[in-house]
Regions:
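Bacterial N-terminal signal peptides
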Residues: 9-19
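Acidic, histidine-bearing metal-coordination/catalytic regions of metal-dependent phosphoesterases
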Residues: 24, 28-39, 43-46, 50-68, ...
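A conserved position within tetratricopeptide repeats
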Residues: 71-72
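Metal-dependent phosphoester/phosphodiester hydrolase catalytic core
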Residues: 91-310
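Bacterial N-terminal signal peptides that target proteins for export
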Residues: 1-10
Length: 310
């Protein structure tokens, strides 16, 4: 932000689309989980998720043969070995939980930097942070500016597999085990909302129902376990990842554009759902020197050519 605070109410974005409409196309999108071998698209970072998927499908011999091809690869060979041990059913193999994960994890801690801010402070915004080993240095780049907080606005990991909790845990744990991430998370508060790739699959939506499809609540619980937001939507009765918080007199409002989103093919589809919309209208009325409104997708139609995912 890096500027003196003045008594002005600032909205960084304006809701420019109808968010409440009739319950047309009121179901979740079809999942498009891509299990193709990652080398077909040069996606070497997907080697381990593909190997894990084979293991979870019971194709352990195929997984071992596949992973052995990359055993000496420079891309996290220790993780390759971990998955081979998992496929071999070794007694000390990872058991799909935090306790048996082989490496130390560093989770976000939003209780950091709670002292009163000065009239100038810096906020970092990010997202679209799929795991690419050579690019993990980005956390060092962010840490170098020593922001008051980092706000991650979705696609913070690329899971694309909402029905498979083991896959979700692997992606979170892998990121939390990286030294660059650990260094940043130990000194900067990190807040997060999700988008399609860490909630569902590409350009997907959850639909208006709280517990349909059944995977929605499970994805939400894993998200909660791996971030440290002040609260998560309306809690158990109304799951979601929307929340707000303050730094001094600056009000940060972050919304959830996936859990209750309806099909963009319907007439006047909702992006937020009625409960979140009610919360948002009330929250935006709170007086602040600045109100910073954060969303996982553009809120203006037609800004993504060829896509209605706004």
């Amino acid at each position: 932000m890096n500027r003196p605070l003045t008594p002005v109410l600032l909205f960084l974005a304006i809701l420019a689309v109808p968010l409440i409409g009739p319950r047309l196309f009121a179901q979740a999108s079809n999942l498009r989980v891509n299990n193709e071998k990652p080398e077909k698209g040069g996606q070497s970072k997907r080697i381990h998720p593909h190997g894990l998927k084979l293991i979870l499908q019971g194709k352990k011999k195929e997984a071992i043969a596949y992973l052995n091809k990359y055993k000496d690869d420079k891309v996290n060979p220790e993780q390759t070995q971990m998955l081979i041990d998992l496929a071999l059913e070794k007694p000390n193999a990872w058991k799909f939980d935090a306790k048996t994960w082989p490496w130390k994890r560093t989770l976000p801690n939003t209780s950091l930097k709670k002292d009163a801010p000065s009239d100038k402070f810096t906020i970092a915004f990010g997202g679209g942070a799929g795991y690419v080993p050579p690019h993990e240095r980005m956390w060092d780049t962010i840490g170098a500016i020593d922001p008051r907080a980092l706000l991650l606005l979705g696609d913070n990991v690329y899971i694309d597999d909402p029905k498979t909790p083991e896959m979700q845990l692997f992606h979170y744990y892998r990121r939390q085990s990286q030294p660059e991430w650990a260094k940043l998370a130990k000194k900067v508060p990190i807040y997060a909302i999700w988008d399609d790739h860490d909630f569902t699959t590409n350009d997907g939506w959850g639909g208006p129902a709280i517990d349909e499809p059944k995977w929605k609540r499970d994805v939400w619980k894993i998200f909660k376990d791996n971030w440290d937001n002040p609260y998560y939507g309306g809690g158990e009765k109304q799951p979601g990842c929307w929340f707000d918080f303050w730094i001094g007199k600056v009000h940060f409002v972050l919304i959830d554009g996936r859990y209750y989103r309806e099909s963009p093919k319907g007439k006047n589809p909702s992006m937020l759902g009625p409960a979140q919309m009610k919360w948002l209208k009330k929250t935006l009325k709170e007086p602040a020197t600045f109100t910073v409104f954060c969303t996982n997708v553009p809120v203006t139609p037609k800004v993504k050519p060829g896509s209605k995912d706004t």
